[in-house]
Amino acid sequence: MSLLDVEGLRVRLATPNGAVTVVDGVDYSVESGEVFGVAGESGSGKTMSMLALLGLLPEGAVVDGTARFADRDLLRIPRRQLRDILGREIGMVFQDPMTSLHPMLSIGRQLTEHVEHHLHLGRRDAEARAEEILHDVRIPNPAAALRAFPHQFSGGMRQRIAIAIALACRPRLLIADEPTTALDVTVQAGILRLLDRLRREHELAVVLITHDLGVMSSIADRVSIFYAGRVVESGLRENVLQRPRHPYTRALLDALPHPEAAHERELVAIGGSPPAPSAIPAGCAFHPRCRYTQDSCRTEVPLLVAVDDRTLACPVDPLA
């Protein structure tokens, strides 16, 4: 059995103009020790699908489906039990560590309070664990770092500290939401190497949410591509990214710069914009932007079905 099994996940959010569906029937699973990549443009539903599991959606949100984590349905258990799981068994790393870290509290206080609450350790043991995890994520001079404040660190170091807090209680699953977006390329590579090392050393499952297929290609074992609240293609990284079979996946890859081929190919922008959740077009949601649109694409919603080495929601193969 997978560590996390999500089936039929639907999320509706309340807006001034009525409820809108932002996640529409999503299925996926995550295995222990793997990195599961979730990619798509802004507004594709990738982050909302994870926040739904953790009870972190805005007030008034309606969530349907099942999300079984270690034999418990995260969508059905009491909120108090869910809060205990979040932090102890599931860690979360957000995009901007400057907003996820409290600017007025020392790093030591933020780490030790987290450990004391979830692991019920005394102050001395909590401080020892805090220093240990800072060392584990390669923070120089961990003892001094515990006395410092977030603004005293670079963006890359702050993100390492955020990862340390998320992993301080030795969770089984880490959800990392765009953890490298605000970082330069060199620091980004260091964070990805850190996540890869930690998951191998601790048999940690990682859900990596990103809009950058380049990031995902460097670390993910399996990937799911989201568009307009649905999964359109999913499978092993090498299959999906080396031979994409959904036009949207193909378009994302065509728009990705390849330094080694900078003088041999032009970047191809994806025409148009992702639809707003309140204005999803009929048929395939991607058809207004697709180079391979057929008449049926305008009226029929493609089902996500198993096709050879992946699951796919499109009858057209852009590489055929």
Labelled PLM ranges:
Residues 111, 163, 187, 191:
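Hydrophobic anchor residue at the start of the ABC signature
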Residues 62-73:
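Conserved ABC transporter NBD signature motif
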Residues 55, 175, 179, 183-265:
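P-loop NTP-binding/switch modules centered on Walker-like glycine-rich loops
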Residues 236-320:
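Charged, flexible cofactor/metal-binding loops and thiol motifs
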Residues 39-40:
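The feature captures the beta-strand-to-loop junction immediately N-terminal to the Walker
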Residues 168-172:
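A short, proline-enriched helix->beta-strand linker immediately N-terminal to the Walker B motif
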